[in-house]
Regions:
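Short, low-complexity disordered leader/linker segments with a strong preference
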Residues: 1-34
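Surface-exposed patches in mature extracellular/periplasmic domains of secreted proteins
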Residues: 68-73, 77-78, 177-180, 315-321, ...
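Extracytoplasmic "Venus flytrap"
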Residues: 29, 36-57, 83-89, 112-113, ...
Length: 352
């Protein structure tokens, strides 16, 4: 009996030791800091999912090549485990569970879109896993009291409210009429709320308030009404596919409005895809290469854009740039925390 107890105690000790080792190595394997990310590589958000992944990879390569992350007197390099969330919120939540519970990831990068970020945030919060996200701009993400969710971008309600202000300014300070068409996702609905606030603030009038179809492939019904009612401003938000559909059908149906304000113009590569038909669209953006901000890793926007194009073969949209910024934020937080303890890293992120 005593021998059995000794054997049982020895086995239990091995189990505890093994479990502790797995937990430790999950966050740092040798000299690598393992981050997890569920990204839309297929489905309706796939183009922006690729932009997001490319931005992450660009920053990982740059940080690693410039000395990595210094914690506790040692140097570490970033690595990322990716899974395809298929542009599906349920799948994104499942993959977050997998990354944390099975792969042992203790630090997460966000997905693309507010809807998928909204699906993942409760999972990372439950496990106390810090997540830095770069592409979930919905205001509702930041009103739920999450303590482990951090973002590098401005909220969606600030994307196109300035378009209404500009239209009023160009109308000699007089109110304008506004037509709107929005996707039924968290991001676009927050953009809509910002536009509605601007309409109210300026005394302007909403004359069309339509929902874009789920597949974002046809907005002819809205455009027929626009031709009939002749609003001063047409506002559209439907991610990349919605932007492409809008420009294509506006040209096909010969719709003419004094101002067209949209989201996702650069991600959709409108100027390349639709040429002159995309000219004069007023487009919201979180970043542009001509901005004068500088840092020690990418120098400035023009240099970042040139390096990105050399690596991936196209001019970076803001989704890529803000994704790169998420890695810089994580590096800074790890080094200020001087630890891989999740709570300490979380506190460092909160102080950023």
């Amino acid at each position: 009996m005593r021998l059995n107890k000794i054997i049982l105690s020895f086995v239990s000790a091995l189990v505890i030791l093994f479990s502790t080792s797995v937990a430790s190595f999950a966050k740092v394997v040798g000299d690598k800091i393992i981050l997890g990310a569920a990204i839309s590589l297929t489905g309706k958000y796939s183009s922006n999912g690729v932009h997001t992944q490319n931005g992450y990879n660009m920053a990982v390569d740059r940080i690693n090549s410039m000395g990595g992350v210094k914690v506790g007197g040692k140097t570490y390099k970033f690595d990322i485990i990716y899974y395809d969330d298929e542009s599906n919120p349920k799948r994104a939540a499942q993959l977050a569970e997998r990354l944390i519970s099975q792969d042992g990831v203790e630090f997460m990068l966000g997905p693309y879109s507010s809807g998928l970020t909204k699906a993942i945030a409760p999972v990372t919060e439950k496990y106390g896993v810090p997540m830095v996200e770069a592409n979930g701009a919905s205001r509702s993400l930041f009103t739920k009291g999450y303590k482990y969710l951090f973002a590098v971008l401005a909220p969606a309600n600030l994307y196109l409210d300035v378009a209404i202000d500009l239209a009023v300014e160009k109308n000699n300070g007089k109110p304008v009429t506004v037509a709107m068409a929005f996707e039924q996702d968290a991001f676009s609905q927050d953009v809509r709320l910002g536009v509605l606030d601007a309409i109210k603030r300026t005394g302007s009038k909403k004359v069309i308030d339509d929902k874009l179809p789920k597949e974002l492939n046809d907005m002819a019904a809205t455009l027929v009404k626009v031709k009939q009612m002749k609003p001063d401003v047409l506002v559209v938000s439907g991610h990349t596919k919605g932007a492409l559909t809008a420009i294509r059908q506006i040209a096909e149906m010969k719709v003419d409005v004094p101002m067209l304000a949209m989201t996702h113009c650069d991600a959709a590569k409108l100027s390349k895809q639709h040429g002159k038909n995309s000219q004069y669209a007023l487009c919201a953006s979180q970043w542009h290469k001509t901005l004068t901000y500088k840092d020690n890793f990418f120098k400035d926007g023009m240099t970042y854009a040139a390096d990105f194009e050399k690596e991936f073969g196209y001019d970076p949209p803001y989704q890529s740039a803000e994704s790169s910024a998420a890695l810089l934020v994580f590096k800074d937080a790890f080094e200020r925390a001087n630890s891989f303890d999740q709570k300490k890293v979380r506190d460092a992120l909160a102080d950023t």
